[in-house]
Amino acid sequence: KPHASYDIIMHFFVLEHISNPVSFLREQLKLLKSGGKIIFEIPNAADPLYSVYDIQGFERFYWSIAHPWYFSEDSLRYLLDQLDCSYEVLLDQRYDLSNHMIWARDGKPGGMEFFTDKLSIELENGYKQALINTGKCDTLIGIISKN
């Protein structure tokens, strides 16, 4: 039987690969001390390259049989509501405007910071914040707290 001995469990871009994410997270909760946290990061199904720009090359790149699950902010909240614990869902944008411009131009990745010196860091940061504010960002972060 698992012993509750951990303060924090972290995983990055794992949950979308798990066939039963609710059971997976429940098993992790058993490993946490009271007040412990599970922190995880997953891709957002509302990634702007798909949901805003509809870049065909990105769609072929993004949708993978290796991912039995794709989560939006709402579907992640629905999943976490099944755990009987408190949680937060945070939104983040990992890839910048330059990367999105290269995807639009070339139909493939590889543009991180490519145009930043020609544009500005303020534009890059503003772009990322606008995507986060609209929920059309590329990353979701879950923070689950064991009661």
Locations of regions flagged by a protein language model:
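Short, flexible, glycine/charge-rich loop motifs used to bind or transfer phosphoryl groups or to couple energy/partner
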Residues: 1, 58-59, 131-132
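Conserved SAM-binding loop
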Residues: 1-55, 69-82, 139-146
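Short linear motifs at secondary-structure transitions and domain/linker junctions
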Residues: 14, 44-47, 61-62, 114-122
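Residue-level detector of flexible, active-site-proximal loop/helix-junction positions
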Residues: 46, 59, 75, 94-97
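Generic structural "secondary-structure junction" signal
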Residues: 51, 63-65, 99
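Short glycine/proline- and charge-enriched loop/turn segments
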Residues: 54-63, 103-111
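Soluble, non-transmembrane catalytic domains of enzymes that act on hydrophobic metabolites at membranes
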Residues: 57-64, 70, 82, 88-93
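A C-terminal cap/extension of S-adenosyl-L-methionine-dependent methyltransferases
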Residues: 89-147
